From Swiss-Prot:
Protein name per UniProt: Chaperone protein DnaJ
Cross-referenced Pfam families: DnaJ, DnaJ_C
Cofactor note: Binds 2 Zn(2+) ions per monomer.
Chief location category: cytoplasm
Molecular function via GO: ATP binding; heat shock protein binding; unfolded protein binding; zinc ion binding
Free-text note regarding domains: The J domain is necessary and sufficient to stimulate DnaK ATPase activity. Zinc center 1 plays an important role in the autonomous, DnaK-independent chaperone activity of DnaJ. Zinc center 2 is essential for interaction with DnaK and for DnaJ activity.
Protein family (similarity comment): Belongs to the DnaJ family.
Binding site for Zn(2+) 2: 195, 198, 217, 220
Source organism (scientific name): Myxococcus xanthus
CDD domains according to UniProt: DnaJ (cd06257), DnaJ_C (cd10747), DnaJ_zf (cd10719)
CXXCXGXG motif repeats: 180-187, 195-202, 217-224, 230-237
């Protein structure tokens, strides 16, 4: 089973959103790649922490995770279908009955795909005990219907802020419904003939059905035609496969940005075209740099003498080091703007800026020399510096 996200962040399952955020920030600062350059273990831990925060910081994702566990994050997961399927499994008296939150017996997505694609349960005809048709419940058309386009898929990718600013290439490996090689996606393994259950009418009475009366024939799904199902895919025309590809992430993405890869989604059924693949980015917080839109903000420490007398200071940026001039008599909190040193615009506009916020740092140890300098400096002030401090 996948790592427990609550354990990864070190919080209770009842933790508030603020507690989750505090735990994430603490761990992100500890394991961030910029703080641990070249440390693969820290990098892997940072990815785990970011993945846990992505789910537990989102109310809807957290609800699904609490109810269905890690299966809710898998490609192709559909909450409504999962709820309906679990209710069906419970009514059929199967193990792992519905209504049990994740953490007890859990929810098995494998059962869902197995029954849909003929792995077990639903079988080639797509039927179920009591005349209940899983295929119709999930909106699946008959295996002899026309070609259907495959579903669009979404894969989430974790990025550092540096990768989001500069752009990157990322190798991906993920599971997706691929075209069955045995039947070339048709779902059948023999000639099409008149359905022997409904005699070509497409309608059949179902004894023991949930609503009674006649409905779409469970054998041909209302088409009136039938053919032997493919033994490999159970008539679905698709089988799960491991896909590998490299995706180029453009500079300027933010959390929630999507990169579309045409034709890289789920395979179409019965020879239909494949869906698209969407790469959704999740940009981790940086321990030092804050992002606001396309602008970046960085606190710049300076010494007392640099603030008083002025100085040329080296500053790291995502585009390389630059030298900035700190003006004499600069106060703590003074803001300096570096034009075009922020985040590129995804819309093709001007690049954002980098804002430096001066932070005057005093010595951490008071030596005799420092004390004498401070006493001499105190005499340079003109009156009480707090004389205008009124409420």
């Amino acid at each position: 089973m996948a790592d427990d996200y609550y354990q990864t962040l070190g919080v209770d399952r009842s933790a508030s959103a603020e507690d989750v955020k505090k735990a994430y920030r603490k761990l992100a600062r500890k394991y961030h790649p910029d703080v641990n350059p070249g440390n693969k273990a820290a990098e892997e831990k940072f990815k785990q922490v970011s993945a846990a925060f992505e789910v537990l910081s989102d109310t809807r994702k957290r609800k699904l995770y609490d109810e269905f566990g890690p299966d809710a994050e898998k490609i192709g997961f559909d909450e409504k279908k999962a709820e309906a399927y679990r209710a069906y499994k419970a009514s059929a008296g199967s193990a792992g009955a519905g209504g049990i939150p994740y953490g007890a017996e859990g929810f098995d997505l494998g059962d869902l795909f197995g029954d849909l694609f003929g792995g077990r349960g639903g079988g080639a005809a797509g039927g179920a005990p009591g005349g209940f048709d899983i295929g119709e419940m999930f909106g699946r058309r008959g295996r002899n219907a026309g070609p259907e386009r495959g579903e669009d898929l979404t894969v989430r990718v974790q990025l550092t802020l540096a990768e989001a600013v500069s752009g990157t290439e990322r190798p991906l490996a993920f599971n997706r419904p691929g075209r069955c090689s045995t039947c070339s996606g048709r779902g059948t393994s023999g000639p099409v003939s008149t359905c022997n259950v409904c005699n070509g009418t497409g309608r059949a009475r179902r004894s023991g059905s949930l609503f009674g009366g006649a409905g779409a024939c469970p054998n041909c799904h209302g088409t009136g035609k039938a053919a032997p199902p493919c033994p490999q895919c159970g008539g679905a025309g698709v089988k799960e496969e491991l896909a590998r590809l490299t995706v180029k992430i453009p500079a300027g993405v933010h959390t929630g940005s999507k990169v579309r890869l045409s034709g890289q989604g789920a395979a179409g059924t019965r020879g239909g075209p494949p869906g698209d693949l969407y790469i959704e980015t999740e940009v981790a917080e940086h321990p030092l740099v804050r992002r606001e839109g396309d602008d970046l903000h960085l606190d710049l420490p300076v010494t007392v003498s640099e603030a008083l007398l002025g100085a040329d200071v080296r500053v790291p940026t995502f585009q390389g080091e630059v030298t900035v001039k700190v003006l004499p008599h600069s106060q703590s909190g003074r803001r300096m703007r570096l034009k075009g040193r922020g985040v590129p615009s995804l819309k093709g506009g001007a690049q954002g800026d980098l804002y430096l916020h001066l932070q005057v740092k005093v010595p951490e140890e008071t030596t005799a020399e420092a004390r004498a300098a401070a006493e001499a400096l105190a005499r340079a002030y003109q009156g009480d510096v707090r004389r205008e401090l009124t409420l």
